[in-house]
Design a protein with these regions (language model features):
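Short helix- or helix-capping micro-motifs
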Residues: 18-20, 114-125, 149, 170, ...
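Short acidic/glycine- and proline-prone juxtamembrane loop motifs at membrane-interface regions
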Residues: 129-140
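Membrane-interface anchor segments at the N-terminal boundary of transmembrane helices
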Residues: 81-85, 293-375
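Transmembrane-helix motifs of polytopic, lipid-linked glycan transferases
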Residues: 88-108, 142, 146, 348-352
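Loop-to-helix entry region of an early transmembrane alpha helix in multi-pass inner-membrane enzymes
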Residues: 59, 63, 67, 75-99, ...
Length: 419
């Protein structure tokens, strides 16, 4: 027993530290006492209800998130039970991401140094607070990080099972967050030659299964709502945020996310018409209002980089403790500066590693591509605080650790012990 504890002491310490920190933040901000349910959370609850109780699909939220969220319905759970389950799943994925980060960094760092890097995601306020909300960020981050873990294992072992699992996770992730679909398809394209060489092997079942789920989602949306699409959320997002803001800039008006006439009009339409109107408006503005579209995009990108966690702003002092407002202010300011720091670090270190794509498909270069893709994609939306960028923080930490390990000064203290 002692030998097992000694062998796995670092992962066990990681889990313990993560849970302790989660409880500390919970006590300071009264996270388990909050009753606010965000519109996105209501959407995810509704998608689970549609899948498990009505056997239909959701217009905005694809099937994988609905499947994960709604599992307790199989056991007669109430809606309140879904939120309790969400906390368990979020914490599992939140801890799992740091455990994977530790496993990956100890390949080129000593275990002690890898342990320090693996702890860093715990102390990003945004991801910790989001554990208490029915949202996708921590689940999505875990899926993508596990995908890259498998990709690095494939590079090390040349075992196609790892590549198959990696690509299947990426493809499945577009049924959690549809915005990742272009990155997932690009990754599949980059490894298409290898995939085609192995198309008859048993390990391809993972990729085939993911593709089948995507086809079911697309065909189901056509049958139920009228279009071959994964989700209608993309059109709503760029119409109501990016192009509505560009239209406001054009007409000299101040943009408001709430009470947005363009958004109200769009939501009055059928889902198929929402997609059509959003697409037509995007094309029209790109032709006639391009400078303001670029300005709106840059404005969104800057806002998503410099703002803190919106969920922290909304916490309420339910227990009337005297220290609450101070802790709330510190937590928000911390999340704001963490967003700025990790976004900037992630962007810079990703630029450093993405150069390798011109010579070889290294795991670091592909991870850097994901970080840059996510940051740049965030420009189509706004008003969500650090939610867009915090999914990149663990990847930025890994790339930073990798870069530091390659410097002579840091290498002396971090090279793993020879076995």
């Amino acid at each position: 027993m002692f030998a097992i504890l000694k062998k796995y002491r670092y992962p066990l310490f990681l889990v313990l530290i993560g849970l302790l920190w989660l409880e500390v933040l919970n006590l300071l901000l009264q996270l388990d006492q909050q009753t606010l349910i965000y519109p996105d959370s209501s959407n995810y609850l509704e998608s689970a209800q549609k899948m498990y109780l009505k056997f239909t699909g959701h217009y905005y939220r694809p099937m994988v998130m609905a499947f994960i969220t709604g599992l307790p319905y199989l056991f007669g759970s109430s809606d309140a039970g879904i939120f309790q389950w969400s906390l368990i799943v979020n914490v599992f994925c939140w801890l799992g991401t740091s455990l994977l980060l530790f496993q990956m960094t100890k390949e080129f760092l000593s275990e002690k140094i890898a342990f320090i890097f693996a702890m860093l995601p715990f102390f990003t306020i945004g991801s910790t607070v989001l554990n208490y909300h029915l949202l996708t960020e921590n689940i999505f981050t875990f899926f993508i990080f596990l995908s890259f873990y498998c990709l690095f294992r494939y590079y090390k072992t040349n075992n196609f099972w790892f590549l198959s699992f990696s690509l299947s996770l990426l493809l499945s992730s577009m049924l959690i967050k549809p915005g990742v679909k272009f990155f997932a398809l690009l990754m599949l394209l980059l490894f298409l030659k290898t995939v085609l060489k192995n198309y008859k092997t048993k390990s391809m079942i993972l990729i085939y299964g993911s593709v089948l789920m995507i086809l079911i989602q697309i065909v189901g949306m056509k049958v139920q709502y009228g279009d071959f699409t994964i989700s209608y959320i993309d059109g709503v997002t760029y119409h109501n945020y990016l192009f509505s803001k560009a239209d406001c800039f054009k007409n000299g008006k101040e943009y408001h996310q709430i009470n947005n006439p363009r958004a109200e009009y769009l939501f009055s339409l059928s889902f198929s018409d929402q997609k059509r109107v959003a697409t037509e408006d995007a094309i029209h503005q790109m032709k006639t209002n391009f400078p303001n579209v670029v300005w709106a995009y840059g404005h969104n990108l800057l806002e998503n980089t410099k703002t803190g966690n919106a969920c922290v702003i909304d916490v309420v002092n339910k227990k009337n403790t005297g220290y609450f407002e101070f802790c709330k202010a510190v937590a928000y300011d911390s999340s704001k500066w963490q967003n700025r720091l990790f976004t900037l670090l992630g962007f810079l270190v990703s630029l450093y590693y993405i150069r390798q794509l011109f010579t070889r498909k290294s795991g670091e270069a592909l991870m850097a591509m994901f970080v840059l893709y996510t940051i740049m994609l965030s420009g189509i939306s706004s008003g969500q605080g650090d939610r867009f960028h915090l999914v990149t923080f663990p990847f930025a930490i890994f790339l930073l650790a990798k870069w530091l390990s390659e410097t002579e000064r840091f290498k002396r203290f971090s090279v793993p012990l020879q076995k």
